[in-house]
């Protein structure tokens, strides 16, 4: 089984071909292809290549499946003894992708 570790949106993801993944929002239309050049590691069976910091010539190709927003995260700011409470919420945008190929 081949897999790779990519960097996008300031996070690292372990990906394999055919896998669906929710990443930080990309400004790419649904159905289009996107290429990730920042590949930190590529493994194909027992053959593992680790980059310093990235693997030269390696790329991961994916197709954008959908754009959306995660569930709401609610927070409460509370000041004791002051009769003050503030409720807030946040919904982060995401891009769902399907990994179509790993090239090393």
UniProtKB/Swiss-Prot annotation:
GO terms assigned for molecular function: rRNA binding; structural constituent of ribosome
Pfam families for this protein: Ribosomal_L21p (PF00829)
Keyword RNA-binding annotated: yes
Keywords: Ribonucleoprotein, Ribosomal protein, RNA-binding, rRNA-binding
Gene Ontology CC annotation, any one: ribosome
Presence of keyword Transferase: no
Superkingdom of origin: Bacteria
Entry's Gene Ontology BP terms: translation
Subunit structure, as described in the record: Part of the 50S ribosomal subunit. Contacts protein L20.
Its job: This protein binds to 23S rRNA in the presence of protein L20.
NCBIfam families, sorted: L21
HAMAP family cross-referenced by the UniProt entry: Ribosomal_bL21 (MF_01363)
Family, as annotated: Belongs to the bacterial ribosomal protein bL21 family.
Record's protein name: Large ribosomal subunit protein bL21
The species this protein was found in: Pseudomonas entomophila (strain L48)
């Amino acid at each position: 089984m081949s897999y790779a570790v990519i960097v996008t949106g300031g996070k690292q993801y372990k990906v394999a071909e055919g896998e669906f993944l929710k990443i930080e929002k990309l400004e790419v239309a649904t159905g289009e292809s996107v290429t990730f050049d920042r590949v930190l590691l590529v493994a194909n069976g027992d053959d593992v290549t680790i980059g310093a910091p990235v693997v030269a010539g390696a790329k991961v190709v994916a197709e954008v499946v959908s754009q959306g927003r995660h569930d709401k995260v609610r927070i409460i700011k509370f000041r004791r003894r002051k009769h003050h409470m503030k409720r807030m919420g946040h919904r982060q945008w995401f891009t769902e992708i399907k990994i179509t190929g790993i090239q090393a």
